[in-house]
Amino acid sequence: MKKKYRIKKNEEFQEVFKRGTSVANRQFVLYVLDKPEQLYFRIGLSVSKKIGKAVVRNRVKRYIRQVFHEERDRIEIGKDYVIIARMPVATMEYEEAKKSLLHVLRRANVFH
């Protein structure tokens, strides 16, 4: 995923947290912020050290990025998405994590 599609700066994360709307399930919290002037969507990932060691955290981040990559044609543009992973996702396989993340995305109405 190209750098322009990622949220990296703390100020950008804080803006999404403050002004965005959130949807959650047991594995993920999703914050969505409208950015109508943006011609693409951006994602920011937050995986706490509570989830596990670096190997586990990096695997969870790869899972999330892969879901967004596979679903990129269906996801609405002009929005910023911040995904926070919760503890149960650490022990999940990719297909389970994908199903859970898609559930959160559907609840947030991000598919067109």
From Swiss-Prot:
Keyword RNA-binding attached: yes
Transmembrane segments: none
Alphabetical UniProt keywords: Endonuclease, Hydrolase, Nuclease, RNA-binding, tRNA processing
GO MF assignments: 3'-tRNA processing endoribonuclease activity; ribonuclease P activity; tRNA binding
Cellular component terms (Gene Ontology): ribonuclease P complex
Statement: the UniProt record of this protein carries the keyword tRNA processing: yes
GO BP terms in the entry: tRNA 5'-leader removal
Broadest EC class assigned to this enzyme: hydrolase
Gene3D superfamilies per the UniProt record, alphabetical: 3.30.230.10
EC number: 3.1.26.5
Source organism, top-level taxon: Bacteria
Catalytic reaction annotation: Endonucleolytic cleavage of RNA, removing 5'-extranucleotides from tRNA precursor
Similarity comment text for this entry: Belongs to the RnpA family.
Quaternary structure annotation from Swiss-Prot or TrEMBL: Consists of a catalytic RNA component (M1 or rnpB) and a protein subunit.
Function of the protein: RNaseP catalyzes the removal of the 5'-leader sequence from pre-tRNA to produce the mature 5'-terminus. It can also cleave other RNA substrates such as 4.5S RNA. The protein component plays an auxiliary but essential role in vivo by binding to the 5'-leader sequence and broadening the substrate specificity of the ribozyme.
Classification via HAMAP family: RNase_P
Protein name, entry field: Ribonuclease P protein component
Record organism: Anoxybacillus flavithermus (strain DSM 21510 / WK1)
